[in-house]
Amino acid sequence: MNYAELLQAARGQMGPCRACPVCNGRACGGNIPGPGAKGSGTVAIRNFDAWRNVRLNMDTIHENFTPDTSLQLFGRTFKYPFFAGPVGAMTLHYGDKYNDMDYNAILVPACAAAGIAAFTGDGTNPKVMEGATAAIAANGGFGIPTVKPWDNATVAKKMAMARESGCFALAMDIDAAGLPFLQNLTPPAGSKTVEQLQEIAREAGVPFILKGIMTAKGAEKAVQAGVAGIVVSNHGGRVLDDCPATEEVLPEIVEVVAGRAKVFVDGGIRTGGDVFKALALGADAVLVARPYVTAVYGGGAEGVACLTEKLGAELADTMRLCGAAALKDISRDMVRV
């Protein structure tokens, strides 16, 4: 299966998603339920466009080499510096082909087999986290359960379930505070204080990653809370209209974190060249979400392998043509903003 065949197979299988040749947010706009962004739908488009505006500085005067795309992270070795991002409420947003449990049962082992890992989603149905953690446990802990910012008791319960899976890291998408189903809950859910996050990070038992950081101030608070990593993310434009693109804020966040935590970024990253750009701007790794949904719906495990190898080959090609033999060699002067 090649990528064009994957897209063709996915069309008509994903509810309102059209499995576009380029997943740039324009066709789905503000379609929620569905894969679109909130309100005007322009934040997802801005995410994509921002990476297009970063250009690559080609330099082929160097020794011949085979690029080393491997990433060392939290005691694990990955084939590539990118991960499948967390996606949930599959039936609501993508039709009835897969529910969350079925989706994760395909995604988690397929990512592990491809040499990367999947962040898994969470939901109001307890079976979502149960299914995700079961899939991670069955694959040697090769996955990152992502817990929503529920009330403290619910967070503690779900994190305990996540730890039992043997996961190598655990995440919370704090930006999910903007999702309607988390608002007006009793007990309160959504935003967390630094003190609450400190407690969650202490109780995690494994490296704790906080997803949904969009300002230098927010990054500093996350570091003060003791997180092992942050994800620069605006939730794919699905929680706050008119916010900036992740690429636009990444450099200032990297600067303030200053190596005290790992920095991931997502939002509109669609090619291996985009992965390279993110690393050149200071990210340690990236998350890719919507395209992995298309991969699962279009080809199951084979689709996940197809997309992963496509992104990996593009990354290696970019490294070769910009003079970076390994990820550590990717530097700011290799891109033009």
Question: What do these predicted ranges mean?
Answer:
Residues 117, 127-153:
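Long, hydrophobic, well-ordered secondary-structure blocks that form the structural core
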Residues 108-109, 137-138, 150-265, 272-296, ...:
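Alpha/beta enzyme core
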Residues 2-79, 330:
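An N-cap/entry alpha-helix motif that binds or orients negatively charged groups
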Residues 94, 119-121, 143-150, 182-188:
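Flexible, glycine/proline-enriched loop segments at strand-loop-helix junctions
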Residues 1-26, 237-262, 270-337:
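Conserved active-site-proximal phosphate/metal-binding subdomains
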Residues 49-57, 112, 116, 164-167, ...:
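Generic secondary-structure signature for well-ordered alpha-helical cores
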Residues 38-46, 102, 106, 153, ...:
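Conserved active-site and cofactor/substrate-binding residues in soluble primary-metabolism enzymes
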